[in-house]
Amino acid sequence: MRAVLLVSGGMDSLVATALAHREGLELAAMHVNYGQRTWQKELECFRQICVHYGIVDRLEVDAMFLSAIGGSSLTDATIPVGPADLAGTDIPTSYVPFRNANFLSMAVSWSEVIGANRIYIGAVEEDSSGYPDCRKVFYDAFNQVIEHGTRPETRIEIVTPLIAMSKAEIVRRGMELDAPFHFSWSCYKSEGKACGVCDSCARRLRAFASVGMDDPVEYEVRPNYLQ
């Protein structure tokens, strides 16, 4: 069976890739550049992950229209990336409006062309309070969209293997699978050293600390987010 992996270069997509690789599937990987602040580092990580898992069939997509639309601190330099607020329930400035729907649409198109039956995405329900397109109900609904919007003989399913996991569980699972976390990047702000203070860095650092492991990525600062 053939599967398309949506690989941002982040921790979650890395572990989703490791899980798909363990299944023995024929893998193809897609990476999307949408004008995010750390696009160069994310692309570098995507390529390193593909080499690590022997993924030859790759597609690097330019989706700069999401940057032109704006509305997110990830794509608009005039909107600052705020400090971590792990207890917050509001939609953060880093939310890219309807981003994952755009990514999935491109992945479905490619899957139809290359005959893939599954699309893996490292979405996590734990993030859904801030990112509505990380909810399980969203992916269930999108599977219906695929069924009704593709050729009758097309059979493509979105697979979200991490959807019910916590970030700590994702790190633990990645360790069990010997996933190369040093080839992943989570920081929203920086491409040299991870900032350590944005929401994504905070969630990652807290997850590694929760399982008693050191994150191999280099940080400007490493606050203790377990306190």
UniProtKB/Swiss-Prot annotation:
MF terms in GO: ATP binding; ligase activity, forming carbon-nitrogen bonds; zinc ion binding
Enzyme class: ligase
Domain of life: Bacteria
Metabolic or biological pathway: Purine metabolism; 7-cyano-7-deazaguanine biosynthesis
EC number in record: 6.3.4.20
Binding site for ATP: 7-17
Keywords: ATP-binding, Ligase, Metal-binding, Nucleotide-binding, Queuosine biosynthesis, Zinc
Any Pfam family: QueC
Cofactor binding comment, as recorded: Binds 1 zinc ion per subunit.
Catalytic reaction annotation: 7-carboxy-7-deazaguanine + NH4(+) + ATP = 7-cyano-7-deazaguanine + ADP + phosphate + H2O + H(+)
Cofactor: Zn(2+)
InterPro entries, per the entry: QueC, Rossmann-like_a/b/a_fold
Binding residue positions for Zn(2+): 187, 195, 198, 201
GO-annotated biological processes: queuosine biosynthetic process
Function: Catalyzes the ATP-dependent conversion of 7-carboxy-7-deazaguanine (CDG) to 7-cyano-7-deazaguanine (preQ(0)).
Family under the similarity heading: Belongs to the QueC family.
Stored HAMAP family: QueC (MF_01633)
NCBIfam families, A to Z: 7-cyano-7-deazaguanine synthase QueC (TIGR00364)
PANTHER family noted in UniProt: 7-CYANO-7-DEAZAGUANINE SYNTHASE (PTHR42914:SF1)
Protein's name in the database: 7-cyano-7-deazaguanine synthase
Organism: Chlorobaculum tepidum (strain ATCC 49652 / DSM 12025 / NBRC 103806 / TLS)
Organismal lineage: Bacteria, Pseudomonadati, Chlorobiota, Chlorobiia, Chlorobiales
The gene coding this protein: queC
